[in-house]
Amino acid sequence: MKKLLIASLLFGTTTTVFAAPFVAKDIRVDGVQGDLEQQIRASLPVRAGQRVTDNDVANIVRSLFVSGRFDDVKAHQEGDVLVVSVVAKSIISDVKIKGNSIIPTEALKQNLDANGFKVGDVLIREKLNEFAKSVKEHYASVGRYNATVEPIVNTLPNNRAEILIQINEDDKAKLASLTFKGNESVSSSTLQEQMELQPDSWWKLWGNKFEGAQFEKDLQSIRDYYLNNGYAKAQITKTDVQLNDEKTKVNVTIDVNEGLQYDLRSARIIGNLGGMSAELEPLLSALHLNDTFRRSDIADVENAIKAKLGERGYGSATVNSVPDFDDANKTLAITLVVDAGRRLTVRQLRFEGNTVSADSTLRQEMRQQEGTWYNSQLVELGKIRLDRTGFFETVENRIDPINGSNDEVDVVYKVKERNTGSINFGIGYGTESGISYQASVKQDNFLGTGAAVSIAGTKNDYGTSVNLGYTEPYFTKDGVSLGGNVFFENYDNSKSDTSSNYKRTTYGSNVTLGFPVNENNSYYVGLGHTYNKISNFALEYNRNLYIQSMKFKGNGIKTNDFDFSFGWNYNSLNRGYFPTKGVKASLGGRVTIPGSDNKYYKLSADVQGFYPLDRDHLWVVSAKASAGYANGFGNKRLPFYQTYTAGGIGSLRGFAYGSIGPNAIYAEHGNGNGTFKKISSDVIGGNAITTASAELIVPTPFVSDKSQNTVRTSLFVDAASVWNTKWKSDKSGLDNNVLKSLPDYGKSSRIRASTGVGFQWQSPIGPLVFSYAKPIKKYENDDVEQFQFSIGGSF
């Protein structure tokens, strides 16, 4: 006769059917095999040969059931054998997600892992259904009310299961109508203008898609409008969002209670001011008394008070604005109640997220010191300086309190590093110049030290160049930088369609020291050496003027030059790559020094500014201008290979690289004494250049706000001019018939211009740059290159 001992868990309680104790000569586990069977045996409180009681059986069932790995657990006696029978839950062997595009697959997988649905976990179907429901609710929150999320479980042999999350995101519901109620003073059209979401209209491509998160932002924009226009008691009392039966259209009603419109009568500061009353009181002057109340003005003063206190160590100060309404006169007074709190000392500066950059490198950019009073201005300056390095996508800072201390904090900078090393490969195609290739290997944060190391090269049909560079920005503790270059160039310009004919071999090196003046200004000085060998050059007019001034004899030119370089730099950009605010400017020069064969100098000026048009810096105006001037001295002319040209990305998009400038005039007999009558499209260049560019940086379509700082789309207009300031005297040696066929190369007004669209992406594989430009002002024989791109890979 079979005696049964059954224990089960029901609603958290144990029910046991009693039987007489017995000695289990053997223990059998039914329902599973392999590792899981062994795990069950190891967890049992009894072993074969031991006495088994009803309490033992109850404990066995309870412990196995609460483990969450079994749908059913039973135990019974068969003769002198204890039998444990289980129905095991499936083990997840694979997880797949299909049909999603709005929510990234990686984000969904991270949430699945966090909720117990990674490979190797026990499958709990109820939790899987709850997860699918939460994902569907998220889609509804972004206006996709018809989205479906179906969890599909495929049962496999050996108690395994595959999970497929099948998603159909569907389209967002459209905002069909928008109605305001209760707005007696402010028109509905004015309130609607404050919103990004707009009712369905034929010309609306994106703005009519309803999204819950954006709707909440729009409601806040309406509140802000009222509060910044005197309606200090205005409230949104009710919102009604109604879906049609098909869940494709949304009708929204917003009820407001405007209240009275107030003027600001007075303002004062009271409370614990940390002994800084004299510094805080003047901040009230920013408020416009006896004018319409604006909450944003009050917020600005609150922030200014916190910032001023923060500069003195009061890093946890609070400011609460208390209004006193006079409804009869429609005025209000504001009392700013300040609590400076305790003065804080910085115990440590800590860094998070810098897996490549060394802590010591980041500390070089800090202005807040450990063991000193907390200074919010210096802490923020550290963030700005880290941003300017260009090593990071994002930089955030916070204050962490110290356990057991009420006046010590740690300042923590959390960074997200970007790929600062790159292998770039560029291609350009021009109507005249054909295909050219450029390649470079660069690491802006070498071994996490902040040093920049680069190898750049160019190879095309008419030459090769290589440049090795190194810059150590922290050469001394005072911030002096040290940089240097070694370069080699070998060109046969006779094969170029845009450059005047000659062969040139150049090599040299230079070293530069940079000295900081303050947070935004620095200057530099440097020394360099350059060797040039020019051969196989056709007799050309401008080149001949240089040869005569140098008194060279024969067909070859060899020069050794030593130069002194100097300059000033200004930088207030908010970050090192893709800046959105600030100005960067420089003035520089280079002049040959005694011991040189040549005698010449070159001067340059560059400025670029970024001006955000919105709070989020998604719309930005950028303006850039540069100028250069060069000339010889001591009765010697500027070398013809030191002239300026324009064209290409960086100077004038839409035109081939180096294709803009005065053209060469060859002798009728290239290596004889013929007269200079042969006008060419080859570019000899000029001794003066100006370039200008204006860009409107716009949000990149179909890219989330979070990713906007890794891509950049812009509409631009470029312009450039290259001319010869000595043309008036230089042309005197030319035949009049030749002059009639030549433009005035001395006119700076011979401007080329182009307009187009540019796109840049700091992709995971490296920087990608594309531009398409159409010339809007060009001259005969200009080499047009409308499409240009550069593709790189990172390491």
From Swiss-Prot:
Question: Cross-referenced Gene3D superfamilies, in alphabetical order?
Answer: membrane protein fhac (3.10.20.310), membrane protein fhac: a member of the omp85/tpsb transporter family (2.40.160.50)
InterPro entries named among the record's database cross-references:
Bac_surfAg_D15, BamA/TamA_POTRA, D15-like, OM_assembly_BamA, POTRA
Protein localization: Cell outer membrane
**Biological process terms in GO annotation:** Gram-negative-bacterium-type cell outer membrane assembly; protein insertion into membrane
Q: Name one GO cellular component term.
A: Bam protein complex
> Keywords for this entry?
Cell outer membrane, Membrane, Repeat, Signal, Transmembrane, Transmembrane beta strand
In the UniProt record, the signal sequence range is 1-19
Q: Does the keyword field hold Transit peptide?
A: no
POTRA domain residues are 22-89, 90-170, 173-259, 262-341, 344-418
Record's keyword annotation contains Transmembrane? yes
Q: Which family does it belong to?
A: Belongs to the BamA family.
Which proteins does it associate with, and in what oligomeric form?
A: Part of the Bam complex.
What HAMAP family does this protein map onto?
OM_assembly_BamA
Provide the function of this protein. Answer: Part of the outer membrane protein assembly complex, which is involved in assembly and insertion of beta-barrel proteins into the outer membrane.
- Fetch the PANTHER family from UniProt: OUTER MEMBRANE PROTEIN ASSEMBLY FACTOR BAMA (PTHR12815:SF23), SORTING AND ASSEMBLY MACHINERY SAMM50 PROTEIN FAMILY MEMBER (PTHR12815)
What is the protein name for this chain?
Outer membrane protein assembly factor BamA
Record organism? Haemophilus influenzae (strain ATCC 51907 / DSM 11121 / KW20 / Rd)
